[in-house]
């Protein structure tokens, strides 16, 4: 969820100890931050799920725990507008996370858990943005909101005013999988270039409507 801020988990793995199928023990990268010597086999083993060997030890890089967060949810009329909102947020804010969900998913979550909708008006899509709750970021997020409204990218929005409200807004996104599991949906974790996401979403929607009317 926090890839925008922290990157992928693999980027935080400084070293691995691995047992291969032949019983050899490999010490990969030796916990070095900078290592330009030869092939970096560490990244071959990350995600290999045991096919190349058994990882029995990992050294992870740590960082300071994040400060309390401010969470925003914006209503968006078109999928393509989500990309523009993301660009504005990244250019003006230190974004921790950026997620989106559709109104169908939101309606299921709200109905199943008796949650409150983020605001009265409904939109086809919603953008959820998380940032650190600092004075500068909090002031800037209102500028982001105004800019997105002026450019007609969002129709409505809410900015959390407390930790409890921030958690409640996250629940709207995080509880989607739990809410939909008994419908037995087809689920995939697919990576798509940001520039191709609008086209991908449109193509998938047309394919689903054609095959599952």
Please report, for each region that a protein language model flagged, where it lies by residue.
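C-terminal substrate-recognition/cap domain of FAD-linked oxidoreductases
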Residues: 64, 70-213
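FAD-binding subdomain of flavoenzyme oxidoreductases
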Residues: 1-99
